[in-house]
Amino acid sequence: MSSTKSGSSKYSSGSSISLIMGFSRSLEKGSFGVLYAMIKGNTFPRILTILSMLIEFCQLSSFGFKHQYPWGGDAGYYLKRIMSPVSHPSDVFGYLGFTILFWIAVGLLILGFLNIWYVAYQFYRGKIANIWIIRTLRWFVSFSVAVLFIPIISLLLIGLDCEGSSEGTILRKFDNETIQCFRGANLPIAVISIILIVVFSIVAFTSSATYYEYDTNVKSRFSKPHARFDVTVLFAKFVFAFFNSLVDFVPWLTSITFFVFMVILTFGSIIVLPYNNQRLNQVRSGFYTVVLWVSFMTLVTMGINDETSPATCYITIVGVFFAFPIGFFSNMFYFKWLSSKVSDIQILNQSPSMDLKDANKKGKRNSVEKESSPTSKVTWGKQPITLGSKRQIIFPFFKKKFVMSFFVEIMARSILNNNNEGVSSSSNESIERANNLYQCGLQYFPNSDLLWMAYCNFLFTVRKDRHIGYAALEKLRRMKPSFDVRFFIYQRDKEREQIMDSDLRGPEHTGKIQDFVSYMEFKKLYYGAKRHHVKCLNYIKRFWGHLLHETVDLHRLSDLSGRIATTENKANESYERLLALNPNSVRVLRDYSQFLEEVVKDKESSYKLQKKAEAIEDIMSKSQTTDFKISDIKAIDSDEDDIEKTLQEPTAIQLAKIDADIEKSGSKSGSSKSKDDSSESSSSSKGRRGKYKEFQQSNAINKLSWLMIGTTCCCIIFLIVVLVVFRGLEVKHTNAYQGIISITDCANEAVQMGMHLNAMQAYALVAGVGNNTVEASLIEIARRRALVKRGIIIMKNIHDAIYWGEGNPVSYVGDNLSQLKARDGYDIFDIGSVIFTFDQFNRSSTLLDNKQMIELYSQPSVNMSVLVAPPGSNTTSLYTQTYNAWKAGNAFIESAMLASDVTFDELRYSVNQNPNFKFVTINAPVIMPDIYNKVQTAYIDSLVSDITGTLDAILYTWCGIFAVLFLICAVLFRPIVRKISREKIRTLVLFSLAPKDVVVKLSTKKIKMVSLDSGSERDNLFDTTDDDGRDDHLGEDDNNIQTPVGDNNNNNNNNNNNNNNNGSISSNVTKSDGEIGSDGVRSSSGSNVLNTSSPYRDRRPLMDSTSVLASTATLNNRNVRLQAKDEEITNGGGERKGSDATRTALSEDKKYGWDGKSKRNLNKKSLKSILGRLHWSYILATFLLFGFITMGIWVTFTVVFNNSQSGYTLGKSCSRSLNSRVINYYVAELYTYSQYVSTQNMVDAITELQSSHQSLPYLEEVRPLMEGSYGCWALNKSTCLPPSSMYYEEVNSGLDRVVDSLAKKAINLAYTDQAALLDSPDLQWFLALIDYIFIGLDTATFTYFDYFLEKQEWANTVLTAILSVSCVILLVVHVVLFRPFMNHLRIQHIHTLALLRLAPDDIRYMEVSDKVIDED
């Protein structure tokens, strides 16, 4: 019982171990597949190797200048800023930036790992992954390991860099944000970081150990004998990143670690000499010596620990210039010393023809002589061709203890390098010396897998001895080598497998498939070509099988013919690409030859390819190795001009495009016509080509296709133009908003100037009266005078900007709006300091071109009041004079300039008789606002008119484009579609006329490939991108039902007989008299069904046979074929000599319902319905095109039109602000003792204020200001009302209540007695709050302005999105509808031509009447 348990436990343990070992082998196989796909022929080019070395130098140097080291002085500060600006890029952005960067890196790494897993899985299954996936994998591993290893590891370590605190364990990098280390949001980051560090490190170390070029013959890349030193460098990088990320708070530990590892790397780079290129080794050693110097000075800096002294910095910088040459020359001297050890090695001068025994004897004598000499270091014994298993060469240097096995490879490298430098007189002698050195080294280091790997590499790449190389490889395999050596063996095995497939690749070093990925792509392409080839033959067989039915479905025939043409085209393209990659592949040449013969019917080109394949095969069979000379192949049959041309240009065998130009095909075929044809036949052939050209629609389809491309491009360009126009309107609309505010502010300044002049007069009148001192009045007058002068400049600039058409009047506003815009981020300049000249305006606005604006600025339409004060008279009167808007504004500004300069005495005594002063004060409250209100209205109307005109132009243009589209459909599409459809039916009807024996023979022909691949099942191992796989089941009923023999066994037997009777096709068709004996149909002039005629009559053939096969050589004479057929009929041997399959099919006529003589039923309805859908296709596509564009334009029209009305709303808000100033003007007049006070004008201004205020929309953006939640709206917050103010509650209730109070109090003041006016609380309310109200109303206006600008930007975004989507939709409509439609037309035409290639000559020249086509 116990023994049973023990046995079972042993069995379980053994099975577990075997499972583990099997899994490890599977894992190794997958990883080796990934590495091989990634590495083969695609290691770093020279320039990338140099760049990666420079990046590595910078990364390693930066570890000496981290933040924890006390580099002193400004020099130390800048060194740390330059060499190590940040610990990691994520530190710059905080924890949020680190998180974003972390997940981006994680996503890219996961994609890379998935890529690795996919490639490994495919290789494990024996497949090859997609080519682009392999290329992506190469760049991912190369870039992430060689360049980004330190940044990625450092980034992953940031989430693990924790420290303890009172709040728990937090991330040390972001201690100010208090991020918990293994809790909350950082927990998944920490877990994923640990996993990715392990996985990424495995990937990095594995690729570093294997990702290198070992072939010294490759000149485009730097080769290496091994990559173990690179693994050491990568480990040092990992340690540096780990220590500087997690323990950087212990600078002594990081600095010592830095120094120790740099000592190892520096001496390692000198001793190991990792690259075969010695100059690169020297440069690398120089870089490592520089970093070693930096690490040493880092220790010195830590010891001094003085952050004020820059001495160590300067010493470090100076020492760099000495450290590099020290490392450089140390490497060079070491290599020379090691090379000098082999300088005395001598080899026997053996001629190539020398007998091996004689050479051994001579070698023995020389070795004895050399051993007797005092300078001899090497003893040569007898040296047969072996692997060094016996100690026959004595080299005392290898007995020394410090000598390591890799010294042998370095010394052999020096021997070969000396040969390259011209030291050795013979290349073969150097190779033999190196070989002997390797064998000597293997005797002293027999267990060194590294040395055996170097020796195998030498045999394969340098000595070119594959036999001994593979023997050495097997020896190495039995040694249980390390991982990198096992991968080297795997590489050589794969290369051997690739070489063994020579019948597919052809001779080595020819073609373009030396790269592994290119080779696998070549194989994948080859199996795809075979698949298409076989499918094409199957479809041809199905096509003829369907014709055995009594009722022939033309739709099924059309479908099969389409598949024949499609697979033929794919196979042809695949074969041409294969020959372009490798023109000497025997298997491809044979398969392509068969394809040209059986499908394309191009026998001459097929013969050329077959002959070339036989010649190459003969050379390859005679050769004992895989080394070929391409000149041997190119010399095949060089005496024949046509074959020579074929061999020199393998891709010159071009199939004629099935839709090629008929004129070119006709000219080529005409030159190859047989001389036996009569002149009448030649002229008849030209006539047939001319008639065929009438229905040949290739050129028409191409032109129509380009026309549709042009039409779609025009529509897209139209939408782009519309978008540009609408964006231009948006800019114009935005500038118009600016202009509306500017116009109102111009009127505001005019009203304010009038009020200030009245105030100046009032202060002059009350000077010295009561508490009003003269000094105080003068100060107030001076302040008001400065405001008037500034207002004049502002008004002048705005007035000129509007008239001259300033394109961007954003700065042309009053002081309140200017501050509001500046606070909101607008670029504002001061317009109140200097008057701008004409040249300083950009004058790009076109709104002034409106008729209404032109009339307003050029026609007298404004009545201005002018004061009449005759000299010497105390009476004054007012006179009305008509101005235009431009002259009125200029007159007002000029008068204000003069009025602002009046003296104190003039203000006090004689200003009422000053016409300039009174011109301003009288016209300011009514006339000037009225002028600018008209200008504003005309300005807005001009904008709306411009928008409406643009929309109308776009609409009319689109209607014209749609009309053109409709004409294209009616005039071009319909005739071409109808013509192609009818010719399709006409061609299919012809096949129903084929003799039955021909149909039976072609439907039972056995499909057999010439080139049989022993690994034919391997094509199932390759992924396919074919989209015709789903069509393989189409017509399976044809194979089952339409087979003329009852069972498949009979089929196969009969097919064998058919191969011997390819030329015997029974036919009763007689071209001379137009009879078809087997079908019982005789052509006659009165027949409406079928008409045949002689070549001398005007018949309408579907295609000239020589036109279809334009690339073929001279065809057999048609008269000879007809004569042969007549002889067969005459001798009566057609049926007797027919195949068994033909006799069997004829005996089973009843099974198919057609006896071969009676007329068959043709089902044309389904095909006609399908072809009829073509008309609906282009109609639907056209209306979709029209619909999408119309919908996009309609939406954009709606958005633009709605926004165009927003100018009126903004104008009302501006008018409300203007009316408040007019009201304030009249209130000021009430206490300035003015004799021109008009109560009615004041009431009108109040009414307009209320009207504007009540009609403005209640926007969400304005609601806080109106309801009081906005707070203090003063521009200067120091002027806000304190809570202790008696007006605080009223103002705090919102601008809506304040405006209402303004209107009510202004009405009260208008009807208050003059004597009680000064004591009125309403007047005190005005004096306290009016400036505050102005700012509030201006803020409301700016809010409306900003709202409409945002709405305009949103509309612009919507317009851009809609029109962009419309452009994409148009492109999609073209790609999804128009392009497939044109391709469908072209395919229908191509299929028609492909059908003609299948048509026997017996029916090809027949004419089918229109009645047969039209009948159902």
Swiss-Prot record:
Residues 1024-1039 have a biased composition (Acidic residues). Residues 1048-1062, 1083-1094 have a biased composition (Low complexity). GO terms for cellular component: membrane. Residues 356-372, 1123-1144 have a biased composition (Basic and acidic residues). It is found in: Membrane. Disruption phenotype: Null cells produce tiny macrocysts and have increased numbers of peripheral cells during sexual development. Macrocyst formation by null cells is much less sensitive to the addition of exogenous cAMP compared to wild-type. The mRNA level of phosphodiesterase (pdsA) is higher and that of its inhibitor (pdiA) is lower in the null cells compared to wild-type during sexual development. The expression of regA, which regulates the intercellular cAMP signaling pathway is not affected. Signal peptide: none annotated. One of its GO terms (biological process) is regulation of gene expression. The chain crosses the membrane at residues 47-67, 93-113, 140-160, 185-205, 231-251, 253-273, 285-305, 315-335, 706-726, 953-973, 1179-1199, 1325-1345, 1358-1378. Gene3D superfamilies: Tetratricopeptide repeat domain. Residues 356-377, 662-691, 1018-1103, 1119-1144 are annotated as: Disordered. It is a multi-pass membrane protein. The keyword Cytoplasm does not apply. Keywords: Membrane, Transmembrane, Transmembrane helix. It comes from the Eukaryota. The keyword Protein transport does not apply. InterPro entries: HAT, Tiny_macrocysts_regulators, TPR-like_helical_dom_sf. Regulator of the cAMP signaling pathway specific to sexual development. Controls the levels of external cAMP by regulating the expression of phosphodiesterase pdsA and its inhibitor pdiA. PANTHER family: GAMETE ENRICHED GENE 10 PROTEIN-RELATED, TINY MACROCYSTS PROTEIN B-RELATED. This is Tiny macrocysts protein B. It comes from Dictyostelium discoideum (Social amoeba).
